[in-house]
Design a protein with these regions (language model features):
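Short, linear, compositionally biased motifs with a strong N-terminal bias
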Residues: 13-14
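Sec-dependent signal peptide recognition
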Residues: 3-10
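Catalytic glycan-binding domains that act on GlcNAc-containing polysaccharides
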Residues: 21-194, 198-199
Length: 199
């Protein structure tokens, strides 16, 4: 006989998995929020708290994890064959590394925040954008340079011009953010209307 207490963790995991599945169309901001309405509420809350535009938040998540809550960097390989260590501790929607995530939790007094939750991830992105604005004086609306700082880190941002890959990534994020922004103009009014959510 299977004890109920033993299966509770599995029930929680599968429920969390179902709620965190990747949206069907991650190329369209309206489609994302129509499928995951609470995500719009979370992204809007981050914008109101930190000033990071919603389209920027989405573009960062799209680039970092493609909306996969369990995303991790692929493992490196020994002798090009044997799976080895991962190149960093990046995880979740925002691909935040452990050290920066712990700093975020301390500074925002959010001890229970997790990288696998969209709400916490977009709040983290908003916090990071806000700090980048304070530290590097980069406008919160400057998607290109904000992503360079996100990718390189505050300390290494000054060397971004030597990193061709970072520049390519930042340009793609800027393009994606512009696409999301234009799409949002078509559905934001409807999304801002009060909705009752039944769980």
């Amino acid at each position: 006989m299977i004890h109920f207490k033993k299966i509770i963790p599995f029930i929680i995991f599968f429920t969390f998995s179902a709620c965190s599945s990747i949206p069907k169309n991650t190329q369209n901001s309206c489609a994302i929020f129509e499928e995951r309405y609470l995500w719009y509420k979370h992204a809007k809350a981050s914008y109101e708290k930190w000033g990071a535009p919603i389209h920027l938040q989405l573009a960062f998540v799209k680039k970092e994890s493609d909306f996969n809550w369990l995303a991790k960097p692929p493992r490196t390989k020994l002798f090009k064959v044997i799976p080895f260590k991962r190149p960093s501790s990046s995880f979740g929607y925002s691909q935040a590394v452990k050290g920066t995530w712990e700093q975020y939790k301390r500074e925002t007094n959010s001890p229970l925040a997790t990288r696998a939750r969209f709400k916490d991830s977009v709040d983290f992105i908003g916090w990071y954008i806000h700090k980048t604005n304070k530290i590097l004086r980069i406008s919160k609306k400057d998607v290109y340079r904000q992503y360079l700082a996100y990718y390189k880190g505050w300390g290494d941002y000054k060397n971004y011009s030597k990193d061709k890959k970072a520049i390519i990534y930042a340009k793609s994020v800027k393009d994606m953010a512009n696409k999301y922004r234009k799409q949002l103009t078509l559905c934001k009014k409807n999304l801002d209307k009060n909705k009752y959510i039944i769980f």
